[in-house]
Swiss-Prot record:
Keywords: NADP, Oxidoreductase, Tricarboxylic acid cycle
A Pfam family per the record: Aldedh
Catalytic residue positions: 232, 266
Organism of provenance: Mycolicibacterium paratuberculosis (strain ATCC BAA-968 / K-10)
GO biological process: tricarboxylic acid cycle
Keyword Oxidoreductase in annotation: yes
Origin: domain of life: Bacteria
Protein name: Succinate-semialdehyde dehydrogenase [NADP(+)]
EC number: 1.2.1.79
Similarity comment: Belongs to the aldehyde dehydrogenase family.
SUPFAM superfamilies recorded: ALDH-like (SSF53720)
Amino acid sequence: MPIATINPATGETVKTFTPASDAEVDAAIARAYERFLDYRHSTTFAQRAQWANATADLLEAEADEVAAMMTLEMGKTLKSAKAEALKCAKGFRYYAQNAEQLLADEPADAGKVGAARAYIRYQPLGVVLAVMPWNFPLWQAVRFAAPALMAGNVGILKHASNVPQSALYLADVITRGGFPEGCFQTLLVPSSAVERILRDPRVAAATLTGSEPAGQSVAAIAGDEIKPTVLELGGSDPFIVMPSADLDEAVKTAVTARVQNNGQSCIAAKRFIVHTDIYDAFVDKFVEQMKALKVGDPTDPATDVGPLATESGRDEIAKQVDDAVAAGATLRCGGKPLDGPGWFYPPTVVTDITKDMALYTEEVFGPVASMYRAADIDEAIEIANATTFGLGSNAWTNDAAEQQRFIDDIEAGQVFINGMTVSYPELGFGGVKRSGYGRELAGLGIRAFCNAKTVWIGSSKSGDAGGGSKVE
């Protein structure tokens, strides 16, 4: 895949970039490693917080310009892109305010371990490689960058090849915010370069957000090198609606949850599992609202759904829908790519889906909603868990006992009750099963690339850890 900005609304190649050479990659790694050796000791939390807040200021001041860039590169609506830029600022501010507390020493009961003092100290690991996707060009990377930099790590970003301008902007704005040169660098390289970077002994760890095959590849390399990783992979999130729910509010939120970011979000609701007593009413209302969405130019403020980011992505969801309909599924609306330039696919609703269809088993990365009828809560949970993924989930019910069942029994990294799955700096984010492992954001995210070092300090009168016979 070329490293280029290709406008998905027109298919026009706007700008191409020359990939970094092997020598440039080596120089970037060396620069990052040398910077880390100094940065981890010479900077305080207060200094890093000042730079993080300054970076947030720039993101806010440049939000309109940044939004236009993201819209040009991957097709999200301008209003969505601006919200993303502002969310990035919020992420930097959160860690500027909270990093020192989140990484404070955790005292242990020294007496129980025969010590004068004992505690856990969190220290940065070093150079962290971030392999990031195109769907949230800045926010996905900031979820790593803000906590990593505040913890004392340094980062190298290998971004998706279709968002090079976003990738370069992020490194630039972080440096303009005051972080020393080399703390955060973007390398415009193909995916084939990831192995070489990750195997370099100066690179301590990796984080990846992307497809399952990409995650498997990075995990295999990191495992061979014994390097820690965080993987945030695909999702096929359920959106369950029970009879006690506010139906109109559930439908409204469900539509938003499906078409957010033009349907290209790992945590977008994709499978709508509705109790049989309200199934027909829910589907009718949902279809009506999906039909009313405006598809078109993502720079038009009136547009609800823009193009898919890539031609191959548009073709993939078209095939998933076509194959399902050919096998007996029912198309309630949408279902055909729009004529004309660009990679547009309309909001689509499919019912009567069976287990042998790709719509049932695969992630659908576009504005396509799959509908399922459930006889009771047991069947709803069974359908929700009948996937290899386990990223986010949504359940709508005002019954407290049902809420607890969903919290306890849905196999996912996140359960949102009477709402839609959203990432917040204040909440840990990640999945289970084939949606990955490890966590981003909040305290879990900043500690993900820290050495949790156990510290045991004996009294000056005793060098015997444990005070007598010891068992490892």
